[in-house]
């Protein structure tokens, strides 16, 4: 459990060295979820940890999955206004037409013009 907590902290805080060390020691960490079915890509997108997010995706982490609320990593990044995370997820092929729990698409939910441009 402590290993998962350390990994989660490293992902959220952009500690790429410890993220890599953890994944190299235990690859299945890229597939863990919390009590709301949020995984590492959700956390990285939510905190705009683009380097971590790119690494996780390169190791096979799911980045189009929904949590218990119907939120994908892309929606998490859009809701937080994190252009870098949105740009990476779109580049990697995230579903741009996903609809969030509020009934809005990622494009409709975006408040920043640069994010809207990425989602067109």
Curated annotation (Swiss-Prot):
Family annotation (Pfam families): Ank_2 (PF12796)
Coiled-coil zones: none
Single GO MF annotation: protein-containing complex binding
InterPro entries for the chain: Ankyrin_rpt (IPR002110), Ankyrin_rpt-contain_sf (IPR036770)
Chaperone listed as a keyword: no
Alphabetically ordered keywords of this record: ANK repeat, Cytoplasm, Nucleus, Repeat
Single GO biological process annotation from the record: actin cytoskeleton organization
Location of the protein in the cell: Cytoplasm; Nucleus
Keyword Cell membrane: no
Chain positions of ANK repeats: 1-31, 36-65, 69-98
Cellular component annotations (GO), alphabetically ordered: cytoplasm; nucleus
Family, as annotated: Belongs to the myotrophin family.
Function text: May regulate NF-kappa-B transcription factor activity. Plays a role in the regulation of the growth of actin filaments. Inhibits the activity of the F-actin-capping protein complex.
PANTHER family per UniProt: ANKYRIN REPEAT DOMAIN-CONTAINING PROTEIN 39-RELATED (PTHR24171), BRCA1-ASSOCIATED RING DOMAIN PROTEIN 1 (PTHR24171:SF8)
Name listed for the protein in its UniProt record: Myotrophin homolog
Gene this chain is encoded by: mtpn
